[in-house]
Amino acid sequence: MNISPTPKRYSSARSNRNENNIPSMYSDPLYNDNMNQGGGIGHLGGPRNIGNVPTEKIVPEEYRLNSQMINRLIKQNKELNNKLNSKQDEINRLNSLVGSLRAKLIKYTELNKKLNSDLQNFQNSEIINNSITEDVNDYIQVPKKRSVTLGTSPDSMSTPTILKNSHPVDEKINKLNDKLDKLTNLVLEEKSSQSTTSNKSTTPPVTSQPNLFFSKGPSDEDIMVKESVELKNLEDQIDSLKRKLLIKRENELRKISLNQELLELMDKLNLQNPSNAQQNFNNFDISPPLSRSNNESPEYCLECHNRHTSHSQSHNNHNISNKQQNSQYHHQHQKESYLKKPDLPISNPLDTPTPLNKRPT
């Protein structure tokens, strides 16, 4: 027979007795009790006590309280999470509303600024127009007709006092305007006379129709501007005259220095070539500029001419040597007169002095 070699292996460990009908030390007394009473695994009977051992599992009270607390906390946590999600959704919705409101606020602030600027410009234009009309009313005085007779009403009693008070003020203003017109006319006449005497080519300041220009009473700024313009014109004229004088003085000094340099070069040539010195000296004209008149004049001075004429009258028969001596004396005298220091008027002592003429060696 085929018998399992290990039948003990399949025996129930929960049975109360083993194969030898001995109570097992690992058996379940509750299970065995149920089995003995005809219950089994699906038995739904109430708690049964086998001796002093209770059939239900023993659970401590602390564990039960802890489990209840944990369940309550979990439930509360879920509720709080739901509330948090709803609040977050509300925050997102409010953020979108804030963004739209911010855009509208920026738009309306820009519109407000634009409207304020337009209003300010309009008010400024109105103020300017009012000021212009007030000025016209101030300077164009139209007499008003008053048909109300004095003493008929309290209003008529108040009007003469106003007129009496306004008359002296108007008289003072008119006097001041007349004085101002006279002063401006005097200043303009004086300036025009000064400008005409200083330079005739420049146009004098406009003095025609001073009453029309100053009919409204010129301000201090207008007077100062006019005076500054006239002073500037005078300064420009003075500067141009000074510049011309300086250029003229420089040209004269340059001419003198060039003439002196030319004489020095002539002296050097005379020293180098003594044979041709007399011929070159006779051919060269060293007379200073502007010494000749419009008509042709002789190349010798009056003293030499008188000397020559007296000598010719006394001695008619001169030889060639005497003629050469006279000509040498004439040219030597002309050269010494030209080498004298020129007399130039020096108005400014700080100008460059004239160079000294060098004596020929």
UniProtKB/Swiss-Prot annotation:
GO biological process: spindle pole body duplication
Stretches of the chain forming a coiled coil according to its record: 61-125, 169-270
Subcellular location: Nucleus; Cytoplasm, Cytoskeleton, Microtubule organizing center, Spindle pole body
Biased composition annotated in UniProt, kind: Low complexity: 193-208, 311-328
Single GO MF annotation: structural constituent of cytoskeleton
Keywords: Coiled coil, Cytoplasm, Cytoskeleton, Nucleus
InterPro entries: Spc42
Pfam families, per the entry: Spc42p
Endpoints of the signal sequence: none
Entries under Gene3D superfamilies matching the protein: Geminin coiled-coil domain
Protein's UniProt keywords contain Nucleus: yes
Source superkingdom: Eukaryota
Polar residues: bias regions: 12-24
Listed Basic and acidic residues bias regions: 334-343
Annotated region described as Disordered, given as residue ranges: 1-24, 189-219, 308-361
Keyword Cytoplasm annotated: yes
UniProt record similarity statement: Belongs to the SPC42 family.
Function: Forms a polymeric layer at the periphery of the spindle pole body (SPB) central plaque which has an essential function during SPB duplication and may facilitate attachment of the SPB to the nuclear membrane.
Name of the protein in question: Spindle pole body component SPC42
Organism for this UniProt entry: Vanderwaltozyma polyspora (strain ATCC 22028 / DSM 70294 / BCRC 21397 / CBS 2163 / NBRC 10782 / NRRL Y-8283 / UCD 57-17) (Kluyveromyces polysporus)
Organism placement in taxonomy: Eukaryota, Fungi, Dikarya, Ascomycota, Saccharomycotina
Recorded name of the encoding gene: SPC42
